[in-house]
Amino acid sequence: MKYFEFGKENEELMVLLHGGGTSYLGVLPTAKKIAEKYHVVLLAYDGFNPSEPETEFQSLAYEAQGLEDYLIENYGGKVDILYGLSYGCRTLMQVLEDNRLEITTTIADGMSLRDYPDIKSDFWKEVYLFFFTGTFFVIMGRAGKLRKRFLAKITGRSFEEADRILYTKASWKSWKNQDKCLIGKKTDYSVFENTDMHIWYGIKGTVDKKLSANLEELKAKGYPFTCKIFEDMGHGGLIGENTERFIEEVNAVHPQSKGKTEKRV
């Protein structure tokens, strides 16, 4: 894994976690713009980093542990804003489990509210990965123009954005490991109590509509979080092609989070 940092002269630290099947390049333009106000740490996952093509994605826990240790060693574990997009939300949830960290504001953008199936048999795990992961590997991992147009349609993004953010050189092993490590893992939503939690969905396409299908059920369980739906945005559309709007939304929630943190202290 690799960490790209921008705006080190700024006081507040913002950590960005990009989605699966993409590279850090998808959010790089926004990261650089945000760096005018925040000190930005952008994580590039092993196996999905164009600058380290020889690496393989091992597991979500491995990526999260590396990030946690990096933040503790370099910044004392204090994070002002933690942002995750899509698969990055799963990394984000893992990071929130680390009690060594102090995270003020957390934003999960396009977060799936469904767990992977609990499959015990190694044989059936491989069968599941062959069909489930294999489908996404073909559509996203080796996408040509037609598949990118399809992805743009279902995510509510433009073709140009789909073409820019997809990383088509990751290995099958990296793709498989992304999902394999999550089979049987239950999401612990109680970690919402460790931060001021915000969940965003851009429902212009069909992807976030499906990802948010269990939203009302989650609300009913009483976990502390706020949710905002962007009807005019696609999956990841804010951080992707609407940089100014993204910054506005972040700046709107973070000061409130700081106020809540001060009251807790």
Where are each of the predicted segments found?
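Conserved serine/cysteine hydrolase catalytic core
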Residues: N177-L215
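Conserved HGGG/HGGXW glycine-rich cap/lid loop of the alpha/beta-hydrolase fold
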Residues: F4-E52
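Gly/Ala-rich beta-loop-alpha elbow adjacent to hydrolase catalytic centers
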Residues: Y83-L92
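Flexible "cap/lid" loop of the alpha/beta hydrolase fold
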Residues: E97, I103-T135
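Active-site loop/oxyanion-hole signature of alpha/beta-hydrolase fold enzymes
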Residues: L42-Y83
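Catalytic histidine-centered segment of alpha/beta-hydrolase-like enzymes
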Residues: M233-N242
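Conserved alpha/beta-hydrolase catalytic His-Asp/Glu region
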Residues: D118, F137-V191
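Alpha/beta-hydrolase fold catalytic core
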Residues: M1-M14, E36-Y38, L146, P255-V265
